[in-house]
C-alpha cells in the first residue's frame, strides 16, 4: 500500500494497455455476477473471487482453506488466494477487447483531443469511429502514380480513337451527299427533257389543229359559204352558225393561234422553272441536312471529348482524393477501390484511428505546427496553436496518442460496484455492473462472429455496438441517447460517479460522514458559561460509549469490554458517574448547518443535562446564526490527543470572540440581555428616591435593597473610579484620599452602579494604581446594543496589550501554556478569557434585570398618533392635484407616478416622526427599539402609523399606499396589496439562498490555496489609501491592521507618523483621523497612506504575513499557516446569504434597496462579466464634444489634440522663402543665404506643419488630432459636460464600468481598486462591513494569470494562461541564457474560470466540469504539487495550513540537516587519517537543502526508491544500513517521537 505521507505530489496520465494489465488480477470473460442459488460469485464473472479476492476473510471459494494460518496460499482447486476480503475494494480485473475502442473523453470532449491531433473535425472523427465512414490508413504512392500514368495513357488512346472515328464518319457523309446531289442533277435533267418533249408535242398539236382549221376556213372563204355550225378554236368561237366566212376570220384565227402559242410557252417556262426550283429546294434541303449532320457529328465529337476529359479529370481527382487520413463514404470507397485497386488501404472504427495515431511523429508535427503558428495569422494561427498545445502535451508528458484508443478495458474492484440483497430477496446492484455486462456480452459476441468469419457488415455493426457499450460505461449520455435500466432511469456511468454533488469528489472525498457524532434540537442555556454547552445524558452516553466502557473496565465495574458494553446498555447508575468523569477530559464540537464560516463549528466543554435537547449559550447564537425556533445542531467528538488540543487552543468558543470578516466582536449580547442592560442604565427623572445623595456605592445599593431608591432614579454618589468620556449626567471631581485613586461626585442611578460593578473582575487593580486605566471604568451613560458591543471590543483590545497585563498574571500564563507559546498567542488567550468572563457577567446581569424589569407590551402600548389622519388626508389632496395636472397635460404619466410615490413616501416619514414623538421613552416598545434589543422604528411605524407603499413582484412600487396600520387592521384591498410584497420576500429567499451558497462555493474554490506561507516577500509596492467620497468606510477603518510600505508624514508639521514596515494600530488610526480633520479638502484628497496589500504580494505560493497584516479574528498579525483565502471567501459569502434572507423580514415593504440588486451585482463583479447598464468609458484622453443629431441621436466625441513645434534660429544674411502660415512638408526649403558663394547650408523643414516667421526665428507647428466617437443611448445619463477634459478609461455615463475594458484601458492597479470598491459598495450599502483585505484576496486570484502574446524563446504557447510569478521565473531563466523573454498581457478571470484554471487538477476536478478537467490533466500528464487545501483533503493528507505548518517546516529542515551531517561523515570510522578515502567519498559533499520544499521532498521521499542513487538521503540510508544492518525509520531521520508529539 502507498503511504500517503510518503509522497508530496501526484501525477495523472493516460494508462497504456500494459499498465492496465499490470493492475489487473485476471480477465473477466463472463457477464455473470452471482449464482442465483448459492449467491456466491460466478467464476470468471464480474464478481469472480479468483480475480478479485475472497468474499470471506481468510477463506477460499471452495472452502478447502480456512483460517488465517493459510494466509497467502492460492487454492489449487478454485484458484482463490486466502487473504482478507477487503482486497475486493482495490483488486482490479480487465476485459480484453476483440476490437480497439476509443475513449469517449478524448473524442467528444471540447476540444476533441483525438480530432486536433489528426486534424479531423469531431463530426468526421465520430463518423469513422462509429462505422459510418472510411478513413484511408495507408497509400502506396508508387502504385498510385502508375495507376495515374496508365489512366492518362488510356484516356489519350480513347481520345485519339474518337477523333479518328468522327473524321471517318464525316468523310462518309460528304461522299454520300455528293452522290445524292449528282443523282438529283441527273433526275432534274431527265425531268426537263420530258417537259421539253411534252411541250413540243402540245405545240405540234396546236399547229396541227390550227393548220386544219385554217385550211377549212380557207375552203369556206373560197366558196363564200356560211358556217354550217359554230366554228370553235380551242374554246373560242370564231364563227357562229350561218355566219359568212371572211378573211377577217383567218386573221382572228392567227391571233388566237399566237395567243395559244404564247400561253404554251409561258406554261413551258413555268414548268421548267418549277422543276428547277424543286430541284434546287431539294438540293438545298439535302445540303442543309448534310451540314446539320456534319454539325451534329462535330458537336457530338466535342461533347464526347469533353465527357472524356471530364471523366479523366474526375478520375484523376478521385485519385488525388486517395490521401492519408482522408475521410470517405462507403460509396466513395467502393468507387476508389474499383478505380485504383491495391493502391491504398482504408478502414473504419477505432482500430483504423489507432493505426493512424500510432504512426504520428510528434516531434515532426510539433515543428510543423510551430512554423505555422509563426507564419500564419487569424483563424489558421488559432487552430495551429490549439493543435500545437495538444501535440506538446503528448510530447512533454510521455503519453502515447494511441493510448486514447483502448485495447484492454479495466474492470474496477467489485466492492466499488456492489450487489446487495434486499429484504424481499431481490438484489440491488450498481449501474456499473449492467454497463460492464453489456460490454462483456457484446465483446464475446464479436469474438464469436470474428471466429466464424461472419460477413463484414455484421462484424462492423457488432464493433459499433461494442464502441457504444464502452462509451456508455465511461460516460453514459455523452453521445446519443443514454442507456437506461429498468424504470427508464439513466444508468450511472464511471463519469457520473465522479462528477456533481453526488459524485465521488464532493460526496465522499471532500465531505465524509463521521462516527462519534450526533444531532439534536437546540434550546437556550442561560446559565451556561461561554465555553460550555449542555449535552443530553443519553446522547453523551452514546457518543462516549467506548470511553465509558474502557473506564468501567479500568475501575473494575466490568471484567472485559463485552460485559462493560452490557453494563452501559442496561444504563446502571455507575455509568453516569463514569460518564461524568470521562466527559471532563473532552471537548465536543458543535456545528450548525449551513456552515457558512469557520465560526459555524466551535468547541465546547460538555455539561451533562437531562432531556433530549442540546443547550447552547445565548451569546454564540450570532456566530452560528442560530435561533431557538426548532434549529438543530450536530455534535462531534475529536478523538485524538492532538485533535483535543487543537480544539482547546483554536476552536473553543472562548477564543473565537471576534468575527474574521470584520474584526468586531461576534459574541455581542442581544435581545433580552440588551434590554436588561438598557433598563439598568436608563435614568428616569422623578422616580422614587431621585436626587438623594450617598457617600459610597455600598450605601446606594443598601438603599436600593431596602426599597428606598428606585433602580432608575437619578441619585448623587461619591465613587472612587475614572469616569469614561460620554457621560450624560452631571459630575464633580473631588480630592483623592490617597493621592492615587480618583474621587468623583456624580449624578447616576443605582442601575448604572449595578451595571458597572458587574464589569469589574476580582483581583483587578484599583483605578490609578500604577497608572492603571482600563476601558471598563465607570460608564455613566445609557448602554444599548452598540454600547455593549463596544464594551466587549474595548475589553478584548485592552487585555491583548502586553503593558496592560500584570507581571504575575503574565507569568501564570507562561506556566499554563508553556514557554514555547509565542507572546502573541498568550495575549490572545488572556484577552479572550477575560472578555469571555465579562460577556458571561453581562449575560447574567441582562437576563436578571430584563426579568426583574418585567418588560412586556400589549396592543395598548402601541399608540396611533392623533395627527395621522390629517397627514393622510393632506397627501390624498396632493395626489388629486398631481392627477389633475396630468389630465391637463402639464406632466407625463411617468412624472405623475414619481410625484405620487414621493408624496406618499413623505407622508410615511412624517407619520414615522409623529409615532416616535408619541412613544413613551420609558415604555417597553420604545426601550426595545431604542436599545437595539428587538425591532426598529420602521416596524413600530407599521404597527402604529401606516404601512406605507409596497412593491409588486417585479420590484416596482405600487402607488396605492396602505394607509392603515396593524393596530387598526388592514382592509381587504390593503391586505391583498401587502401580500404582494410578502410573497416576493419568500420567493427571493428561496431563489437567492441557492445563489449565495453557490457564490460562497466558487469563492472558496478560487481562494483555497491562498495561505500565509512566508514572513516577508520583500515587495516595495503597495496600494494608496486616500479619502474618497465613493467609499463609505473611513480611512481610519481601512488602514488599521495594515503594514506601511513607505513612511507616513504629517503634511502640516512634517513629523513622521509611521516608519516603513509599521503595523497600524487602532490608536494610530485615530491619530490619522485627527490629522485628516486638521487638513482642508484639497489637502485631504492629496493625503494618502501607502500600505502593503495582498494585491501586490510577491510570494511565489500563497502570501506573506506583512502583505496580509492583521488577522481580524485575533487582532494580531496573521500567523504563518493561516488559510486566509478560505477566511476571505467565507467572509464574503456568509453575509451574502444573510442579505438574501433579509428581504423576507421587512415584509416586502418598499425600501430604497433590495439584495435582489445586490447579490447579482456581487456575482457580476466576481465573475468579471460585462455589467448590466454598462457605462461608456473614454477610449482616449482629450476634450469632450457632445453632438446632438436629428432623431434624438447623441454622440460623444473625444478629440485629442497634440501640438508639436520645431523652432530654428534664422542666421544673419538668410532670406526666408516661405510665407507666414504656409504648409510645409519635411525637407521643404525654408530659408537660404542671400550672400553669393556662401557655403552655409539652407534651412529645411524638420517637421510637416504650418510655418510661422517670428523676427529671427522660424517656428513650424504640427497638430496631431485623434478622434473617438461613441453613440450614447437615449436613456443614458452623462457624467461629463461639453468641453470637459477626460482621461483614458474615465467613466462618461452613469452605470457600471466593464472591468475587462478597464483592464485594457487603465491597467491592473485600476481594475484591482475598482473591483474592491464596487464589491464593498454593495455590501456597505446593505449595512454589512467586510474588511477590504478579504475582497483583495479574491481579486488577487482573479488577476494572478497572464496571457502569452509572444512566446519568445520560451516553451510557452501563444494564448496560454500562466501565473505571473511562473512567467517571471521562466523569463528570468531565458534572459540569463541570452534568449528573448515571453511577452504577456494581464488577464482578468472570473472566479469560476480562475478556479478551473488552477494548477491543481484535483482542486479543479472537484469543483466543476470534472471530466473536462481530468481529460486535459491526463493528456498533459499534469503533476499536482498538493499546495492547496482541497487537493490534500481529497487524498487524505494533512492540509498545508495551520499553526503546525511552521513547526513541520522546521522539523523537515532539521531532518534534512541531520541526514546531510550523516552523509558527510567518513564511511568507515576506523580508517586512519592517512589512508585515502574510498572513491565514493571523493565526490563533493551534498549541499544542504536550499528550501523547505526541497527538504520536505527529501524527507518524504526517503523510502520511495524513486530518487537517484547518489541522492543525499540514499547515501544516509546506505550508511545507516551498513552500520546497523537495517534501514533507518522515518522517525529516526525526522527526530524522536517526543519531538513529533510536541508539534
Curated annotation (Swiss-Prot):
One Gene Ontology biological process: DNA-templated transcription
Catalytic EC class: transferase
Keywords: DNA-directed RNA polymerase, Magnesium, Metal-binding, Nucleotidyltransferase, Transcription, Transferase, Zinc
Cofactors demanded by this protein: Mg(2+); Zn(2+)
Positions annotated to bind Zn(2+) 1: 60, 62, 75, 78
UniProt xrefs under InterPro entries: DNA-dir_RpoC_beta_prime, DNA-dir_RpoC_beta_prime_bact, RNA_pol_asu, RNA_pol_N, RNA_pol_Rpb1_1, RNA_pol_Rpb1_3, RNA_pol_Rpb1_3_sf, RNA_pol_Rpb1_4
Cofactor comment text: Binds 1 Mg(2+) ion per subunit.
EC number: 2.7.7.6
One function term, GO molecular function aspect: zinc ion binding
Positions bound to Mg(2+): 627, 629, 631
Binding site for Zn(2+) 2: 1017, 1097, 1104, 1107
Keyword hit for Chloroplast: no
Catalytic activities: RNA(n) + a ribonucleoside 5'-triphosphate = RNA(n+1) + diphosphate
GO cellular component, as recorded: DNA-directed RNA polymerase complex
Annotated region described as Disordered, given as residue ranges: 1466-1490, 1522-1543
Any one Pfam family match given in the protein's UniProt record, by short name: RNA_pol_Rpb1_2
Domain of life: Bacteria
Protein function: DNA-dependent RNA polymerase catalyzes the transcription of DNA into RNA using the four ribonucleoside triphosphates as substrates.
Protein family (similarity comment): Belongs to the RNA polymerase beta' chain family.
Binding partners and assembly: The RNAP catalytic core consists of 2 alpha, 1 beta, 1 beta' and 1 omega subunit. When a sigma factor is associated with the core the holoenzyme is formed, which can initiate transcription.
Protein name per the record: DNA-directed RNA polymerase subunit beta'
Source species taxonomy: Bacteria, Bacillati, Chloroflexota, Chloroflexia, Herpetosiphonales
Amino acid at each position: 500500500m502507498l503511504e500517503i505521507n510518503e509522497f508530496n505530489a501526484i501525477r495523472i496520465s493516460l494508462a497504456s494497455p500494459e499498465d492496465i494489465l499490470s493492475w489487473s488480477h485476471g480477465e473477466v470473460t463472463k457477464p455473470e455476477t452471482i449464482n442465483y442459488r448459492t449467491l456466491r460469485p460466478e467464476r470468471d464473472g464480474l464478481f469472480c473471487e479468483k480475480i478479485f479476492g475472497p468474499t470471506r476473510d481468510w477463506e477460499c471459494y471452495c472452502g478447502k482453506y480456512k483460517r488465517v494460518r493459510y494466509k497467502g496460499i492460492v487454492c489449487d482447486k478454485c484458484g482463490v488466494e486466502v487473504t482478507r476480503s477487503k482486497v475486493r475494494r482495490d483488486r482490479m480485473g480487465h476485459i480484453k477487447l476483440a476490437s480497439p475502442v476509443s475513449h469517449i473523453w478524448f473524442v467528444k470532449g471540447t476540444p476533441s483531443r483525438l480530432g486536433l491531433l489528426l486534424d479531423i473535425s469531431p463530426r468526421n472523427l465520430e463518423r469513422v469511429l462509429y462505422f459510418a465512414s472510411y478513413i484511408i490508413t495507408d497509400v502506396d504512392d508508387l502504385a498510385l502514380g502508375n495507376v495515374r500514368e496508365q489512366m492518362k495513357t488510356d484516356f489519350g488512346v480513347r481520345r485519339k480513337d474518337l477523333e479518328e472515328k468522327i473524321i471517318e464518319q464525316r468523310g462518309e457523309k460528304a461522299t454520300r451527299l455528293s452522290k445524292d446531289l449528282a443523282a438529283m442533277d441527273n433526275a432534274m435533267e431527265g425531268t426537263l427533257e420530258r417537259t421539253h418533249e411534252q411541250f413540243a408535242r402540245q405545240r405540234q398539236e396546236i399547229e396541227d389543229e390550227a393548220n386544219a382549221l385554217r385550211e377549212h376556213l380557207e375552203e369556206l372563204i373560197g366558196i363564200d359559204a356560211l358556217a354550217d355550225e359554230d366554228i370553235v378554236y380551242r374554246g373560242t368561237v370564231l364563227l357562229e352558225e350561218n355566219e359568212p366566212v371572211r378573211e377577217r376570220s383567218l386573221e382572228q384565227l392567227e391571233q388566237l393561234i399566237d395567243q395559244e402559242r404564247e400561253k404554251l410557252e409561258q406554261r413551258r417556262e413555268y414548268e421548267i422553272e418549277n422543276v428547277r426550283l424543286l430541284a434546287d429546294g431539294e438540293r438545298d434541303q439535302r445540303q442543309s441536312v448534310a451540314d446539320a449532320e456534319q454539325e451534329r457529328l462535330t458537336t457530338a465529337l466535342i461533347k464526347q471529348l469533353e465527357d472524356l476529359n471530364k471523366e479523366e479529370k474526375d478520375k484523376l481527382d478521385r485519385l488525388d482524393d486517395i490521401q492519408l487520413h482522408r475521410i470517405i463514404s462507403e460509396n466513395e470507397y467502393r468507387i476508389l477501390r474499383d478505380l485504383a485497386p491495391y493502391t491504398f488501404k482504408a478502414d473504419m472504427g477505432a482500430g483504423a484511428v489507432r493505426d493512424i495515431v500510432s504512426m504520428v511523429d510528434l516531434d515532426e508535427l510539433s515543428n510543423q505546427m510551430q512554423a505555422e503558428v509563426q507564419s500564419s495569422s487569424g483563424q489558421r494561427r488559432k487552430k495551429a496553436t490549439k493543435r500545437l498545445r495538444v501535440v506538446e502535451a503528448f510530447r512533454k508528458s510521455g503519453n502515447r496518442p494511441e493510448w486514447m484508443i483502448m485495447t484492454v478495458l479495466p474492470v474496477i474492484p467489485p466492492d466499488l460496484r456492489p450487489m446487495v440483497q434486499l429484504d424481499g430477496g431481490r438484489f440491488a446492484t450498481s449501474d456499473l455492473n449492467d454497463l460492464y455486462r453489456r460490454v462483456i456480452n457484446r465483446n464475446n459476441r464479436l469474438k464469436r462472429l470474428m471466429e466464424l468469419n461472419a460477413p463484414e457488415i455484421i462484424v462492423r455493426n457488432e464493433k459499433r455496438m461494442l464502441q457504444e457499450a464502452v462509451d456508455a460505461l465511461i460516460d453514459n449520455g455523452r453521445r446519443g441517447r443514454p442507456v437506461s435500466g429498468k424504470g427508464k432511469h439513466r444508468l450511472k456511468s464511471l463519469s457520473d460517479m465522479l462528477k456533481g454533488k453526488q459524485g465521488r469528489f464532493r460526496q465522499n472525498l471532500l465531505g465524509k460522514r463521521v462516527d462519534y457524532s450526533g444531532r439534536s434540537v437546540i434550546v437556550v442555556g442561560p446559565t451556561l458559561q461561554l465555553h460550555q454547552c449542555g449535552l443530553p445524558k443519553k446522547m453523551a452516553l452514546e457518543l462516549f460509549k467506548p470511553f465509558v466502557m474502557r473506564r468501567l473496565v479500568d475501575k473494575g465495574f466490568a471484567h472485559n469490554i463485552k460485559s462493560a458494553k452490557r453494563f452501559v446498555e442496561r444504563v446502571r447508575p455507575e455509568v453516569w458517574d463514569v460518564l461524568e468523569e470521562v466527559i471532563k477530559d473532552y471537548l465536543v464540537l458543535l456545528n450548525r448547518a449551513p456552515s457558512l464560516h469557520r465560526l459555524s463549528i466551535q468547541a465546547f466543554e460538555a455539561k451533562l443535562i437531562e432531556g433530549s435537547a442540546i443547550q447552547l449559550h445565548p451569546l454564540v447564537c450570532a456566530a452560528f446564526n442560530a435561533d431557538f425556533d426548532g434549529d438543530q445542531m450536530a455534535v462531534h467528538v475529536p478523538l485524538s490527543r492532538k485533535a483535543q488540543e487543537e480544539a482547546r487552543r483554536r476552536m473553543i468558543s472562548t477564543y473565537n470572540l471576534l468575527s474574521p470578516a470584520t474584526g468586531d466582536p461576534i459574541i455581542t449580547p442581544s435581545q433580552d440581555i440588551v434590554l436588561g442592560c438598557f433598563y439598568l442604565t436608563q435614568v428616569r427623572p422623578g422616580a422614587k428616591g431621585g436626587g438623594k445623595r450617598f457617600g459610597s456605592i455600598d450605601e446606594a445599593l443598601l438603599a436600593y435593597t431596602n426599597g428606598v431608591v428606585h433602580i432608575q432614579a437619578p441619585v448623587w454618589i461619591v465613587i472612587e473610579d475614572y469616569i469614561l468620556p460620554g457621560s450624560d449626567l452631571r459630575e464633580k471631581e473631588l480630592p483623592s484620599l490617597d493621592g492615587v485613586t480618583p474621587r468623583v461626585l456624580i449624578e447616576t442611578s443605582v442601575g448604572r452602579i449595578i451595571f458597572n460593578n458587574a464589569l469589574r473582575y476580582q483581583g483587578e487593580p484599583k483605578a490609578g494604581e500604577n497608572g492603571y486605566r482600563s476601558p471598563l471604568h465607570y460608564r455613566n451613560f445609557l448602554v444599548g446594543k452598540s454600547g455593549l458591543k463596544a464594551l466587549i471590543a474595548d475589553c478584548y483590545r485592552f487585555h491583548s496589550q502586553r503593558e496592560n497585563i500584570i507581571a504575575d498574571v503574565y507569568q501564570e500564563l507562561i506556566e499554563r501554556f508553556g514557554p514555547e507559546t509565542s507572546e502573541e498567542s498568550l495575549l490572545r488567550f488572556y484577552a479572550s478569557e477575560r472578555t469571555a468572563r465579562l460577556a458571561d457577567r453581562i449575560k447574567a446581569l441582562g437576563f436578571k434585570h430584563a426579568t426583574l424589569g418585567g418588560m412586556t407590551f400589549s396592543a395598548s402600548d402601541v399608540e396611533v398618533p392623533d395627527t395621522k389622519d390629517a397627514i393622510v388626508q393632506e397627501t390624498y389632496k396632493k395626489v388629486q392635484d398631481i392627477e389633475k395636472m396630468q389630465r391637463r397635460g402639464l406632466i407625463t404619466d411617468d412624472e405623475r407616478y414619481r410625484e405620487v410615490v414621493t408624496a406618499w413616501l413623505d407622508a410615511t416619514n412624517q407619520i414615522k416622526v409623529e409615532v416616535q414623538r408619541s412613544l413613551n421613552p420609558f415604555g417597553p416598545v420604545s426601550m426595545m427599539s431604542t436599545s437595539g434589543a428587538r425591532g426598529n422604528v420602521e416596524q413600530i411605524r407599521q404597527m402604529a402609523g401606516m404601512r406605507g407603499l409596497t412593491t409588486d413582484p417585479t420590484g416596482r412600487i405600487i402607488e396605492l399606499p396602505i394607509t392603515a396600520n396593524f393596530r387598526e387592521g388592514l382592509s381587504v384591498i390593503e391586505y391583498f396589496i401587502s401580500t404582494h410584497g410578502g410573497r416576493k420576500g419568500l420567493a427571493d429567499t428561496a431563489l437567492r439562498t441557492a445563489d449565495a451558497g453557490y457564490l460562497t462555493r466558487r469563492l472558496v474554490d478560487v481562494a483555497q490555496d491562498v495561505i500565509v506561507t512566508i514572513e516577508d516577500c520583500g515587495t516595495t509596492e503597495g496600494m494608496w489609501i486616500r479619502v474618497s467620497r465613493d467609499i463609505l468606510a473611513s480611512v481610519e477603518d481601512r488602514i488599521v491592521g495594515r503594514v506601511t510600505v513607505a513612511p507616513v508624514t504629517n503634511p502640516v508639521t512634517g513629523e513622521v507618523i509611521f516608519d516603513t514596515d509599521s503595523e497600524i494600530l487602532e490608536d494610530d488610526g485615530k491619530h490619522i483621523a485627527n490629522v485628516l480633520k486638521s487638513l482642508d479638502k484639497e489637502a485631504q484628497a492629496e493625503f494618502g497612506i501607502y500600505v502593503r496589500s495582498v494585491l501586490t504580494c510577491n510570494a511565489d505560493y500563497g502570501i506573506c504575513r506583512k502583505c496580509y497584516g492583521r488577522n481580524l479574528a485575533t487582532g494580531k498579525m496573521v500567523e504563518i499557516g493561516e488559510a486566509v483565502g478560505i477566511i476571505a471567501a467565507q467572509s464574503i459569502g456568509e453575509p451574502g446569504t444573510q442579505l438574501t434572507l433579509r428581504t423576507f423580514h421587512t415584509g416586502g415593504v418598499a425600501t430604497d434597496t433590495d439584495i435582489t440588486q445586490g447579490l447579482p451585482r456581487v456575482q457580476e463583479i466576481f465573475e468579471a462579466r460585462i455589467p448590466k447598464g454598462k457605462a461608456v468609458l473614454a477610449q482616449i484622453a482629450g476634450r469632450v464634444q457632445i453632438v446632438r443629431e436629428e432623431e434624438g441621436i447623441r454622440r460623444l466625441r473625444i478629440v485629442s489634440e497634440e501640438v508639436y513645434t520645431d523652432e530654428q534660429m534664422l542666421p544673419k544674411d538668410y532670406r526666408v522663402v516661405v510665407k507666414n502660415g504656409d504648409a510645409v512638408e519635411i525637407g521643404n526649403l525654408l530659408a537660404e543665404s542671400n550672400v553669393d558663394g556662401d557655403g552655409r547650408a539652407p534651412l529645411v523643414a524638420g517637421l510637416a506643419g504650418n510655418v510661422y516667421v517670428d523676427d529671427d526665428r522660424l517656428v513650424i507647428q504640427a497638430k496631431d488630432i485623434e478622434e473617438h466617437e461613441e453613440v450614447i443611448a437615449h436613456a443614458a445619463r452623462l457624467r461629463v459636460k461639453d468641453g470637459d477634459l477626460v482621461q483614458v478609461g474615465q467613466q462618461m455615463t452613469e452605470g457600471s464600468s466593464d472591468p475587462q475594458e478597464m483592464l485594457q484601458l487603465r491597467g491592473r492597479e485600476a481594475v484591482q481598486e475598482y473591483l474592491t470598491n464596487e464589491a464593498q459598495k454593495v455590501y456597505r450599502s446593505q449595512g454589512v462591513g467586510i474588511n477590504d483585505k478579504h475582497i483583495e484576496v479574491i481579486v488577487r486570484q482573479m488577476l494572478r494569470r497572464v496571457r502569452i502574446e509572444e512566446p519568445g524563446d520560451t516553451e510557452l504557447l501563444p494564448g496560454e494562461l500562466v501565473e505571473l510569478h511562473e512567467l517571471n521565473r521562466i523569463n528570468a531563466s531565458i534572459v540569463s541564457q541570452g534568449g528573448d523573454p515571453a511577452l504577456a498581457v494581464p488577464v482578468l478571470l472570473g472566479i469560476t474560470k480562475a478556479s478551473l484554471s488552477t494548477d491543481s487538477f484535483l482542486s479543479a476536478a472537484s469543483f466543476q466540469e470534472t471530466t473536462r478537467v481530468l481529460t486535459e490533466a491526463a493528456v498533459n500528464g499534469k503533476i499536482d504539487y498538493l499546495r492547496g487545501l482541497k487537493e490534500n483533503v481529497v487524498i487524505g493528507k494533512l492540509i498545508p495550513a495551520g499553526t503546525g505548518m511552521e513547526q513541520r517546516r522546521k522539523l523537515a529542515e532539521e531532518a534534512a540537516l541531520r541526514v546531510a551531517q550523516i552523509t558527510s561523515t567518513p564511511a568507515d570510522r576506523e580508517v586512519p587519517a592517512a589512508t585515502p578515502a574510498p572513491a565514493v567519498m571523493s565526490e563533493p559533499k551534498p549541499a544542504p537543502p536550499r528550501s523547505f520544499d526541497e527538504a520536505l521532498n527529501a524527507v518524504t521521499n526517503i523510502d520511495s526508491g524513486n530518487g537517484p542513487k547518489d541522492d543525499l538521503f540514499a547515501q544516509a540510508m546506505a550508511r545507516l544500513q551498513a552500520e546497523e544492518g537495517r534501514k533507518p525509520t522515518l522517525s529516526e531521520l525526522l527526530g524522536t517521537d517526543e519531538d513529533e508529539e510536541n508539534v
